[in-house]
């Protein structure tokens, strides 16, 4: 059976990357929430 996690940097960046987050209002909310919490890494 194939494992479910087949890593790809490109797919990761496109769905969870900083620019992907900034592209939508909800994504910007996510970034701002992580900034407010003091996260070292805002996105993948």
From Swiss-Prot:
Q: Which Pfam families match?
A: Ribosomal_L34 (PF00468)
Q: Which GO terms describe its cellular component?
A: ribonucleoprotein complex; ribosome
Enumerate the GO terms in the molecular function aspect: structural constituent of ribosome
State the UniProt keywords alphabetically: Ribonucleoprotein, Ribosomal protein
Q: What superkingdom does the record give?
A: Bacteria
Q: Where is the composition biased (Basic residues)?
A: 10-19, 34-44
Q: Which InterPro entries match?
A: Ribosomal_bL34, Ribosomal_bL34_CS
Its Gene Ontology biological processes?
translation
The annotated region (Disordered) lies at: 1-44
The record's similarity note reads: Belongs to the bacterial ribosomal protein bL34 family.
For this protein, the record's NCBIfam families field holds: rpmH_bact
Q: What is this protein called?
A: Large ribosomal subunit protein bL34
What's the name of its gene? rpmH
């Amino acid at each position: 059976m194939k494992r479910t996690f087949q890593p790809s940097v490109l797919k990761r960046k496109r769905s969870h990357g900083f620019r992907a987050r900034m592209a939508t209002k909800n994504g910007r909310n996510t970034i701002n929430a992580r900034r407010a919490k003091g996260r070292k890494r805002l996105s993948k």
